[in-house]
Amino acid sequence: MKVSIYAPSYKRPEKSITQIHYPCVKVVVCESQADEYIKNGNDVVVCPDSAQGNISRIRNWILDNLYNDSDCLMIIDDDCSYIGYYNNQKQYKFENDQLLEFCSSSALLCDELGYKHFGFNCVADKGAYREYTPFGFT
């Protein structure tokens, strides 16, 4: 399953660090800011300035314009220092290839269960996780 991961960003190229840790992520920025992000070393996808306004508008632009490029489209924050999971009370951080594999297998599982979208817990606190009951269908 082909997975594409995008991180919308706005007026903060220096804080857009997700690509440092996960080069597979494409940062989505508006035309007027693209040069700043490119100078910062980001690999960008440029959207029109008219798509910008708030995070919901840019996420909708990503869904409307970039979804056909892959089987699974993920949208994450532009300032992630790591993405990981817990197993046996220990935290593990994904490497780039592991993140792609995890997203691909998660998307495949959801598809097989008849679901079309899913999300991950974004809280770093171990107490917020139920590692032995990893799925919720609410």
Can you name each region flagged by the protein language model?
Residues 19-20, 61-65, 105-109:
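A generic secondary-structure signal
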